[in-house]
Amino acid sequence: MSGIIATYLIHDDSHNLEKKAEQIALGLTIGSWTHLPHLLQEQLKQHKGNVIHVEELAEHEHTNSYLRKKVKRGIIKIEYPLLNFSPDLPAILTTTFGKLSLDGEVKLIDLTFSDELKKHFPGPKFGIDGIRNLLQVHDRPLLMSIFKGMIGRNIGYLKTQLRDQAIGGVDIVKDDEILFENALTPLTKRIVSGKEVLQSVYETYGHKTLYAVNLTGRTFDLKENAKRAVQAGADILLFNVFAYGLDVLQSLAEDDEIPVPIMAHPAVSGAYSASKLYGVSSPLLLGKLLRYAGADFSLFPSPYGSVALEKEEALAISKYLTEDDASFKKSFSVPSAGIHPGFVPFIVRDFGKDVVINAGGGIHGHPNGAQGGGKAFRTAIDATLQNKPLHEVDDINLHSALQIWGNPSYEVKL
């Protein structure tokens, strides 16, 4: 294979999957075939999309009811020649799913890149090992927290929140994705003030925390803004990839003057991936493509919290981010939304140690504040790695958290 293989889930009311697959393969490449003269067929053969797999799936009554028609469900795979497109994500996505995304109940499930095609993508600049080296933390999941309620607040409020989270043992603190450039907490001021706070905490407590600052602005200003952030001392750039596009992420990741990790936020991605019938699968969008384009971290809804993703999908995202691939470093999985200390055993069980445990309210909502919330998570992480049930741990911060949010593996009885 020298090009790319696209895998689709289709729902066809003509009940002829083979014919539908061939129509897609032709429609996204040379347009027609049987009516072409033999000589022209020979000339265009190398550009023709090739159907390489058709698999009928069991009938799904819920889908038929939803669509108000009886359809045949199937998985099809089509190979697109590398000759047909330039080696960039806009060209790849337009070739494999451009006008097809408008044509009925079709979902792009996966894209399989040839080794030759992979050479055109950067992958993560740091990856899991590089991030761990920055923090000098190699033997446990990382803990991340989020600034909360920053809109309309000044830099003093940010510094207080940051200090409390760092003292609590949080490894990474990230901006809220809806915190944009503003007069009260401008980008460079957040970075400079944040570094002062984190250096002070490190000198006092010996704990290192990184700050992920939100990179925002117009598309053609992003590189300048990123370089300004780097010059101010930014540790990590948080980026709302799907508000801008995967190619923009790749452009940032490939720039040697932006030598910091990039954290991809999934904002807007639900518009592409939420439906079971249309769009692009979450594992492809939030896993494989983010990794290829250069994200060191990928945030996505966890299977446990307030904006839950199906467990199978969440694990598939993580698989794409962390599976061995000689072409790319591994990206950190960051299952998010509604996470509290009681979920830590499940996160470690399902995602392993190479995961970032990301919490907002589960840290800030602790009765002992963000310091207590961070300490509760760190204690839960340590206990989980020691195979110790959370309810058996003698720690006031963890017990308080379990009282408030519960312990899914063992309901706390007081």
Swiss-Prot record:
Q: Catalytic residues?
A: K99 (proton acceptor)
Domain of life of the source = Bacteria
Entry-annotated residues carrying N6-carboxylysine: K174
> What's the catalysed reaction?
5-methylsulfanyl-2,3-dioxopentyl phosphate = 2-hydroxy-5-methylsulfanyl-3-oxopent-1-enyl phosphate
Q: Which Gene3D superfamilies match?
A: Ribulose bisphosphate carboxylase, large subunit, C-terminal domain, RuBisCO large subunit, N-terminal domain
Give the record's GO biological process terms: carbon fixation; L-methionine salvage from methylthioadenosine
Which residues are involved in binding Mg(2+)? K174, D176, E177
Q: Which family does it belong to?
A: Belongs to the RuBisCO large chain family. Type IV subfamily.
Q: Outline what the protein does.
A: Catalyzes the enolization of 2,3-diketo-5-methylthiopentyl-1-phosphate (DK-MTP-1-P) into 2-hydroxy-3-keto-5-methylthiopentenyl-1-phosphate (HK-MTPenyl-1-P).
Q: Please give the NCBIfam families that the UniProt record associates with this protein.
A: PRK09549.1, salvage_mtnW
The subunit structure is: Homodimer.
Q: What is this protein called?
A: 2,3-diketo-5-methylthiopentyl-1-phosphate enolase
Q: From which source organism is this entry?
A: Bacillus cereus (strain ATCC 14579 / DSM 31 / CCUG 7414 / JCM 2152 / NBRC 15305 / NCIMB 9373 / NCTC 2599 / NRRL B-3711)
Q: What gene is this protein translated from?
A: mtnW
